[in-house]
């Protein structure tokens, strides 16, 4: 039996694959451009080992956009069911500060559970929004 040959993907930086079902869903299509970019950035930082640590300041720098737009993009993804807040941020000048951590609902959970796909339960009209 012949061995399957690998596809010629450039794997030097890793590969981020997003489900076609998600990309063609009305929930995804109703998102703003900043929220769509944030969704991809969150998946880029995803690991099966734990929740994604990604804050507003980091989103401001990587999208790039204003603080208000970054906060709005997080809220939009949360309301649409694409992300769920796991731990809120904490700032303390004497001890270590930590960023917000998120669970991406279309990807497996670090607790060895499958994706919950909460975004499928939310019905959004493209013309009217959430």
Provide a role label for each language-model segment:
Residues 1-58, 62, 80, 97:
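Short recognition helix of helix-turn-helix/winged-helix DNA-binding domains
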Residues 4, 88, 124-126:
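Intrinsically disordered, low-complexity segments enriched in Ser/Pro/Gly/Ala and basic residues
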Residues 6, 21-22, 68, 106, ...:
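Acidic/proline-rich low-complexity IDRs
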Residues 8, 26, 48, 64, ...:
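Proline-rich intrinsically disordered, low-complexity coils
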Residues 10, 61, 87-88, 117-121:
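Acidic-enriched, low-complexity/disordered segments with a strong bias for Aspartate over Glutamate
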Residues 18-21, 40, 66, 86, ...:
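Compositionally biased, intrinsically disordered low-complexity segments
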Residues 44-103, 107-108:
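Winged helix-turn-helix DNA-binding recognition segment
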Residues 100-130:
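Short, amphipathic alpha-helical interaction segments positioned at domain boundaries
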């Amino acid at each position: 039996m012949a061995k399957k040959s690998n596809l010629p993907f450039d794997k030097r930086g890793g590969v981020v694959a997003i489900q076609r079902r998600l990309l063609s869903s009305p929930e995804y299509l109703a998102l703003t451009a900043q929220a769509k970019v944030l969704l991809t950035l969150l998946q880029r930082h995803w690991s099966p080992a734990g929740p994604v640590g990604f804050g507003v300041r980091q989103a401001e720098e990587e999208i790039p956009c204003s603080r208000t737009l970054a906060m709005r993009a997080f809220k939009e993804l949360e309301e649409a069911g694409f992300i769920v807040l796991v731990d809120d941020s904490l700032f303390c000048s004497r001890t270590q500060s930590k960023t917000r951590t998120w669970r991406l609902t279309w990807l497996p959970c670090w607790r060895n559970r499958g994706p919950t796909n909460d975004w499928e339960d939310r019905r959004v009209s493209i013309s009217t929004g959430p």
